[in-house]
Amino acid sequence: WGSFGEGRSKKAESLNSVAVPELERLAAEDKPFMLFLRHMDPHSPYLPPEPFERMFYAGDENDPNNHSLDPVYDFLPFRDYFCSWFPPKCTDAEYICAQYDGSIAYMDASIRIILDKLEYLGIADDTIVVFTSDHGETLYDHDCYFDHHSMYDNCLIVPLAIKFGKGCKKYFRGCKHVQTYAYEKDIMPTILAMLGIETDVKFDGRNLFDVLDGKVPEEPECYITEATWMRKHGWRTPEWKLMVALEPDFHFKPEIELYNLIEDPKENHNVADKYPEVVELLKKRMLDHVAKREKETGRTAPIYTNLNWNGFGRPFTSSEEAYRTMHIGNPEDAKRLQEIKKQD
């Protein structure tokens, strides 16, 4: 992962240094190939190399009068981890956000090298390139600092771009705009369709070109879950987002969260108490979906059975217990930091 003391790592360039020769080898073989590249930027720790470090920041990250990072340093479960890659004496949260932006710009430049190589090798027209991510990120949002373990849209919504050339020209739709939802489960059936590969496998996802052409139903509502740093599930519609905690989380969030995504797209105002009838309606849709999937698969939903997700052996009984137990970073340092906080 890297740390500030180890220096800024050119992670994307390191991967490209392996990927480019592999592309050359595969192109020379002149056979069908699949190449998976897992660029880690802009995953934390955000340590983009120069000049990307200051591309989006012109302030003083060590300003002693700036206290925007105080609540970040005060969050015990992640404090040890943050201190490992934040610059020493850094006080400005905007500087850390700028490192994330710089990491994105650095990755964009590195992906450009891959795309240019496909053109240079003369295989761009016969190559499908899929660009996506496994999660988004919260920066200074929802008091979930520089993390991605939640069910807010910051984390749920990810990019999906599919680039293809003349070899797949029948899939070109011009400048067509369709306002609908795509899911990562749709990627495999879409790619198989583009390659003309038929299979008897019944996918949960859809061919997105069928979605664009109106041949399959839209899926405007979806079931959402989180079971890494918290155990929650919920239901999302174009208008509403419901989140239900199955046990207390270490962010001290309420058990029920409801957001109006039309009026409050950044999900800053929990209106669960104001609209209890909406909570019950969405909860019923969610539980009906879970019951349907349990019947289809013959399995109990893992969100109910994975009770040792936290490594603690049982569900947490309070947010305070979760806060005092969970941590990322060096275990001994985390324990020491928590003991100091207890003494305070």
Task: Name each region found by the language model.
Residues 1-344:
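Catalytic domains that recognize anionic headgroups
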